[in-house]
């Protein structure tokens, strides 16, 4: 259940440059409506089959921005482009090219964030720094998928200090890419319920909050 009091406490401390994205996977439409009523306009889902009924039911809320944060499957790419403004989990060149091609067919311009794997983690997908450097020339050629930033998820078990340092590496990487390529990366999607303060301190522009706002997953 959405907690207006927790949301109020969090939003009171957020810098104006940070956007709160409410993660509503497994949550009911009523929870999203409650969060909307409190002022949230950015909502994230990770499974297309779960997201579509919610997006359809809330179609009258025309100022909602839908964010896709789940693992991108090639056969679900079209539905993602059709329904989401932001795609946080662009994690390899092949899926980026496919999203761009579909977006061109649909005359859409979704905002894409490149998922970066800053530390070794076999459970996470994404580019390493070395892989991204190799793929940058091809990413610069994308026309309809607008690469607007980077996203990362940290492995569990890091200290607060190490989390902030690692998040800072994502900001440094974005700065380097902006200097070395034609991309203009302005968004840093980093920080979740357990580590968002460190992400904000390191320069996050989007934080993805679920459990802290809605309680544990069902």
From Swiss-Prot:
Keywords: Pyridoxal phosphate. One of its GO terms (cellular component) is cytoplasm. Coiled coil: none annotated. The modification N6-(pyridoxal phosphate)lysine is found at residue 25. InterPro entries: Ala_racemase_N, PLP-binding_barrel, PyrdxlP_homeostasis. GO terms for molecular function: pyridoxal phosphate binding. The keyword Transmembrane helix does not apply. Pfam families: Ala_racemase_N. Pyridoxal 5'-phosphate (PLP)-binding protein, which is involved in PLP homeostasis. NCBIfam families: YggS family pyridoxal phosphate-dependent enzyme. Belongs to the pyridoxal phosphate-binding protein YggS/PROSC family. This is Pyridoxal phosphate homeostasis protein. It comes from Synechocystis sp. (strain ATCC 27184 / PCC 6803 / Kazusa).
């Amino acid at each position: 259940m959405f907690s207006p009091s927790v949301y109020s406490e969090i939003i009171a401390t957020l810098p104006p440059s940070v956007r709160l994205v409410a993660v509503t996977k497994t949550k009911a439409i009523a929870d999203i409506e409650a969060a909307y009523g409190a002022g949230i306009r950015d909502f994230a889902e990770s499974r297309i089959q779960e997201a579509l009924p919610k997006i359809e039911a809330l179609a009258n809320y025309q100022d909602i921005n839908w964010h896709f944060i789940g693992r991108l499957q090639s056969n679900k790419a079209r539905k993602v482009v059709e329904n989401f403004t932001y795609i946080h989990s662009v994690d390899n060149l092949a899926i980026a090219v496919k999203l761009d091609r579909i977006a061109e067919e649909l005359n859409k311009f979704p905002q894409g964030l490149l998922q970066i794997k800053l530390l070794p983690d076999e459970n996470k997908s994404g580019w390493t720094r070395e892989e991204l450097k190799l793929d940058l020339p091809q990413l610069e050629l994308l026309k309809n998928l607008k690469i607007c930033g980077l996203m990362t998820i940290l492995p569990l078990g890091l200290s607060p200090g190490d989390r902030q340092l690692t998040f800072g590496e994502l900001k440094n990487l974005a700065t380097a890419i902006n200097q070395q390529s034609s991309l203009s990366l302005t968004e840093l999607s980093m920080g979740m319920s357990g580590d968002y303060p460190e992400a904000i301190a390191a320069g996050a522009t989007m934080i993805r909050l679920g459990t802290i706002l809605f309680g544990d997953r069902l």
